[in-house]
Regions:
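Conserved CoA-thioester-binding segment of acyl-CoA-metabolizing enzymes
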Residues: 1-57, 79, 83-86
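Glycine-rich beta-to-alpha active-site loop
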Residues: 88-132, 136, 307
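Glycine- (often His-adjacent) and acidic-residue-rich active-site loop
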Residues: 57-87, 103, 131-134
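Hydrophobic, secondary-structure "cap" segments at the distal end of domains
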Residues: 141-151
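Glycine-rich adenosine-cofactor-binding loop
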Residues: 296, 301-309
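Amphipathic alpha-helical segments at domain termini/boundaries
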Residues: 2-21, 65, 109, 113, ...
Length: 309
């Protein structure tokens, strides 16, 4: 991999299984080098006749924390995220996402293009883009409703809060939880699936969206929830419109196109810039220099306004 790209993917082989490890510390965002590495090594595994399955995981304590928002609005080298994810989704060999920690935003969207998903008991998944004035723009609004149903998907995306592995398993976001060695369990799980003639793609799971077609309550309840919890925000309405497309469009790619259009509208909306500014500001404030780590938190009992005239 070229050193000019940010982040990388490590490639190793265990028997007939190729292991792709996203390595972009500290939280493994989907930076340019990661996207390039995914595209390169998915292709390599598919071209190797000795490889029968692929495991995608993350280095350290995070699977993939999401998109690299520092690249938003900037030209970057390497394949775009949609291209890299499409390579995974249409892999000739089955792909399992071994979620070793945090899988948020683009991280969960990456797991959703894999055929199977397994997490540790401490894994965290979620689509928090709404908190940045955005919507899940890498297929999350189209795949998640197909996997767990439009109603649950809307609640998850509008809340923007992380979900535990236990709840993710209950709702069907992941297929299994590893209680021991994630890699050992992932290899064993995938070995059982290798002999299957077909390996499910989330994009092809239409039963739940077809069940919601014609049920006005699904979208009405989501709009009521957004009005209550996200009053005045732009992105929630766009998320609902995306899921409406997932429900009503017969062609998955048409829904994806609408998601891209609505994502761009969110990206250009002033709210997005303000909310991302707040996000970076809060992160910076939490890392104020010269404050000892042992400094205790103190309650605020009163506050005064200075310079009010």
């Amino acid at each position: 991999m070229t050193n000019e790209l940010k982040g990388r993917v490590n490639y190793s082989v265990n028997g007939n299984i190729a292991i792709l490890e996203v390595d972009n510390p500290p939280v493994n965002p989907l930076s340019s080098g990661v996207r390039a590495g995914l595209a390169e090594y998915i292709s390599k595994a598919n071209e190797d006749d000795s490889i029968e399955g692929i495991i995608l995981t993350g280095a350290g304590k995070s699977f993939i924390a999401g998109a690299d928002i520092s690249e938003f609005g900037q030209k970057s080298d390497g394949p775009d995220l949609h291209t890299a994810l499409k390579d995974i989704e249409f892999s000739k060999k089955p792909v399992l996402a071994a979620i070793n920690g945090t899988a948020l935003g683009g991280g969960l969207e990456t797991a959703l293009v894999c055929n199977y998903r397994m997490g540790t008991n401490k894994a965290i998944v979620g689509l928090p883009e709404v908190n940045l004035g955005l919507l899940p723009g890498a297929g999350g609004t189209q795949r998640l409703p197909r996997l767990i149903g439009p109603s649950q998907a809307l609640k998850m995306m509008l809340a923007g809060t992380p979900m535990s592995a236990k709840k993710a398993l209950q709702q069907g976001v992941i297929d299994a939880i590893s209680e021991n060695s994630l890699m050992d369990d992932a290899i064993a799980f995938l070995q059982e699936k290798i002999g299957s003639e077909t390996h499910p793609k989330v994009r092809d799971k239409n039963e739940k969206v077809l069940e919601a077609r014609g049920d006005d309550n699904v979208l009405a309840e989501a709009k009521a929830l957004a009005a209550k919890t996200r009053r005045g925000q732009f992105a929630p309405g766009q998320i609902i419109s995306c899921v409406e497309a997932a429900i009503n469009e017969d062609d998955f790619d048409v829904g994806m196109k609408k998601e891209s259009e609505y994502f761009l509208e969110c990206l250009m909306n002033p709210q997005r810039e303000a909310m991302i500014h707040i996000f970076f500001g809060e992160r910076a404030a939490s890392k104020i220099s010269d404050i000892p780590k042992e400094t205790p938190l103190l309650p605020i009992n009163s506050a005064g306004i200075v310079g009010s005239g």
